C-alpha cells in the first residue's frame, strides 16, 4: 500500500542520501558565489572555511582535482571581462607612455641643414694651392698663407726654387708631367721612370731617356732675335721676287704682241 501523506500536509523527511546530495550542492553553490567576489567559502560538515582572496582559476583547478565538473559558464563570463579590461588598460597605458617618449625625443631633433657654406668658402680660400688644386703641407712646408693670391705667388717661387731632377735619367722636373715615387722616396723619379718602377719594379736605362735641355730667358731672347731676323730676310726675299716678276711682265707682253706672219702675208711678200 502506498504511504498516506501526513495530516498536516508537510512532506515526509527525506532519506540520508538525498540530504547529503543537497548539502553538497548548496556548498558548491556557496563556493562559486563567493569565488565570484574573489572570496572562497567552503562549508563542510557544518564548518565554514573562508579563503580570501582566491582567483577563479584556482577554484576551477580544485574542482577538477576533486573530480567535479568545470566551472559554470556564467562564472567564467563574469571573471574574464575583468582580466580583459586589465590587459586593455595596461596596453593603452603603455602606448600612451611610448607616445609621450616619442614626442619628447622629436622635440630634441633638428632637421635643418647645418652646412655653413660661408665657413667652407673661407677655409677653401685659406688653403694652399698648386696649379689651381689644393696642396698638402709636404709640398710647401709648415708656412701658412691667408689669401689665394699670396698662395699663388708662393707657389711660383717654390716651383722655381724646388726644381728637382730624376735620379735615374737626370731629367728636370719642369720637363716631365709629374715627379713620381722611386726607391729613394717620393718625387725622386720622372714620370717615365716612375711608371716603369711602379709597374715592373725595375729602372729603365738612362741611355733611352730623351735628352732635353732647359732654355733660359737669355736663350729665349736670342732665339727670338734669330726668328725676327729670319722673318725679315724672308720678307725681303719675297719683295725682290715680286719686283723681278713685275719687271718681267712687260717683256712678256711685248713678246705676246709680236705674232708670226700668216701664209697669205708670206705669199704677198714673195709676189
From Swiss-Prot:
The keyword DNA-binding applies. Residues 252-271 have a biased composition (Basic and acidic residues). Disulfide bonds: none annotated. GO terms for molecular function: sequence-specific DNA binding; zinc ion binding. Its main location: nucleus. Keywords: Activator, DNA-binding, Metal-binding, Nucleus, Transcription, Transcription regulation, Zinc, Zinc-finger. Residues 33-68 form the Tify domain. Residues 1-23, 238-271 are annotated as: Disordered. The keyword Transcription applies. One of its GO terms (biological process) is regulation of DNA-templated transcription. It holds the Pfam family tify. GO terms for cellular component: nucleus. PROSITE patterns: CCT (PS51017), GATA_ZN_FINGER_1 (PS00344), TIFY (PS51320). Transcriptional activator that specifically binds 5'-GATA-3' or 5'-GAT-3' motifs within gene promoters. Belongs to the type IV zinc-finger family. Class C subfamily. PANTHER family: GATA TRANSCRIPTION FACTOR 19, GATA TRANSCRIPTION FACTOR 28. This is GATA transcription factor 19. It comes from Oryza sativa subsp. indica. The gene is GATA19.
